[in-house]
Amino acid sequence: MPNFKSKKIKEINLPYSKDDVEFLWLAKNDNVSLIYTKVQEESFFLQIKKAQNGFVIKGDKHTKPSKIGYLQKALKIFKEGFCEDIINEAFGLKNNALIEKTPFIVDNFDELLSRLQGKIYIEIGFGSGRHLLYQAKENPNVLILGVEIYNPALTQVAKLAKAQNVNNILLIQSDARLLLSVLKSKSVEKIFLHFPVPWDKKPHRRVIGKDFCKECARVLVQNGRFELRTDSFEYFNFTLEQFLTFPAPKFSLRKNENLEISSKYEDRWKKQEKNIYDLWVWNFNQECKNYELNEFNLSSVEFSKEDLKKIEQNFKNITIKKDDFFLHFESIYKQDENLLLKVAFGAFNKPEHCYLHLDKTIDFAFKEPFKIQENIKAINELKEILKVQFKI
């Protein structure tokens, strides 16, 4: 994560803007200050944290922009405008950093869903993008949707797609399980999962599970196919067991088959003479329906100045666990007379992190989380906790 360390920070008078970077407002607690930052069409927090002999300035990991160049540029402008005695820095803004909006990266699910059409392939954890770009070139009439947790991978593959004149890809930063949950039923032709982290000693952390397999079956078209490629026999066998719970699935099992394209991980495993396993699954015959999305309905909550004082005074770092969702109050920040809450919530295997801005009403400081049922339930619980636990 790009960052730098400074001995001194000047007085921060906001709003402040320079070179398409805007610092609009600041919220803080005893240890951390958050600066609401806009670069072109994206918003995120810069984080200032007290450290030994100074301050560490970096991007907040739960609001970081989809393009690393935005964060690098914001750090550069903040350093030049507000900092003295720089101790060290690790955010050099390169001339080829991806700053301009790229059509290959979508910022949220609403934008994604509006752009999905025709035949769709999904690659989960596309990494360096070798296989994803290969599929895009081989299937020019198919939209290749790549989902990846790590932002740098999105930026790298978007650059490669532009350089190679590949136009039929879309990339999104997300947990794959969350992505599948928002897609329409029977809308995807193929799902690729190549060389996932096997988690052989911690199988509960695997993306594969019963719910994931059900979602694959729901979103795949009739005779649509799930394809796993892995060097872990344990992962291969575990995945097979999950799909065997369906009534009459069909399988293709292969070992050490050379494909037309090889990822950097596959190259490494072959040099180590590891076995490579392929598992293809289709014919799920899964009855399914599209989910009806509800609203968060935050407009029903109103606060007085006295309410906000009580929330600030009575705030506790607490976690509420229900059968199918959780809610964790992580931190609270003061923004003039208003408050900022950081919370984690949602399904246990698809957690969300977000900031809520509290003034006379309550709203999400950034984009809304997607309206899956677990998130709706968690936000409804949050509204009740604010009234009961924090005594307003």
Curated annotation (Swiss-Prot):
Per UniProt, substrate binds at: 201, 231
Q: Which reaction does it catalyse?
A: guanosine(46) in tRNA + S-adenosyl-L-methionine = N(7)-methylguanosine(46) in tRNA + S-adenosyl-L-homocysteine
Q: Which GO terms describe its molecular function?
A: tRNA (guanine(46)-N7)-methyltransferase activity
EC number of this enzyme? 2.1.1.33
Q: Name one Pfam family in it.
A: Methyltransf_4
Q: Where does S-adenosyl-L-methionine bind?
A: 123, 148, 175
- Which enzyme class, named as a word? transferase
Is tRNA processing among this UniProt entry's keywords?
A: yes
- What's in the keyword line of the UniProt record? Methyltransferase, S-adenosyl-L-methionine, Transferase, tRNA processing
Is the keyword Metal-binding assigned to this protein? no
SUPFAM superfamilies named in the record: S-adenosyl-L-methionine-dependent methyltransferases
Pathway where this protein functions: tRNA modification; N(7)-methylguanine-tRNA biosynthesis
Give GO cellular component annotations, separated by semicolons.
Answer: tRNA methyltransferase complex
Functionally, this protein is described as follows: Catalyzes the formation of N(7)-methylguanine at position 46 (m7G46) in tRNA.
The UniProt family comment states: Belongs to the class I-like SAM-binding methyltransferase superfamily. TrmB family.
Under which name does UniProt file this protein?
Answer: tRNA (guanine-N(7)-)-methyltransferase
Q: Could you tell me which species this protein originates from?
A: Campylobacter jejuni subsp. jejuni serotype O:2 (strain ATCC 700819 / NCTC 11168)
The gene it comes from is: trmB
